Swiss-Prot record:
A zinc finger (C4-type) spans 4-27. Induces RNA cleavage activity in the RNA polymerase. In its presence, the cleavage activity of the RNA polymerase truncates the RNA back to position +15 in a stepwise manner by releasing mainly dinucleotides from the 3'-end of the nascent RNA. The truncated RNAs are able to continue elongation. Involved in transcriptional proofreading and fidelity. Misincorporation of nucleotides during elongation of transcription leads to arrested elongation complexes which are rescued by TFS-promoted removal of a dinucleotide from the 3'-end. The gene is tfs. This is Transcription factor S. It comes from Sulfolobus acidocaldarius (strain ATCC 33909 / DSM 639 / JCM 8929 / NBRC 15157 / NCIMB 11770). Keywords: DNA-binding, DNA-directed RNA polymerase, Metal-binding, Transcription, Transcription regulation, Zinc, Zinc-finger. Belongs to the archaeal RpoM/eukaryotic RPA12/RPB9/RPC11 RNA polymerase family. One of its GO terms (cellular component) is DNA-directed RNA polymerase complex.
Length: 111
């Protein structure tokens, strides 16, 4: 890890003109010294049981949970993500949305 000598921000290794250099994301300063030390590595590991949820524009960014025992009307899968939104007036119950983990179908359930 390196810090920018001009502004003190953390510098990140980047590819510039085919070479790996440290570049400050705040002020743009480029450190060309010690290029051999700069290394860009991306490692993504997932266990067999772990799932990655990709939130799409039709899903809220918080409050998403996984549930089992709800049958998808499209493919019959029994696992879905769900979230709750207040879609009607405040004196009405909230609406629960589901998204199938297998086919991606989104459906709603009124309480």
């Amino acid at each position: 890890m390196k810090f920018c000598p001009k502004c003190g921000s953390m510098m990140m290794p980047r590819k510039e003109n085919g070479k790996t250099v440290y570049k400050c994301s705040k002020c743009g300063y480029i450190d060309t010294e010690n290029q051999k030390e700069a290394k860009i590595t991306t490692v993504i590991k997932h266990s067999a049981k772990e799932k990655t949820l990709v939130l799409e524009s039709d899903m809220p960014k918080t409050g998403v949970q996984l549930t089992r025992g709800i049958s998808c009307p499209s493919c019959g899968n029994d696992e879905a993500y769900f979230w709750i939104l207040q879609t009607r007036s405040a004196d009405e119950p909230a609406t629960r949305f589901y998204k199938c983990t297998k086919c991606g179908k989104v459906w709603r359930e009124y309480e």
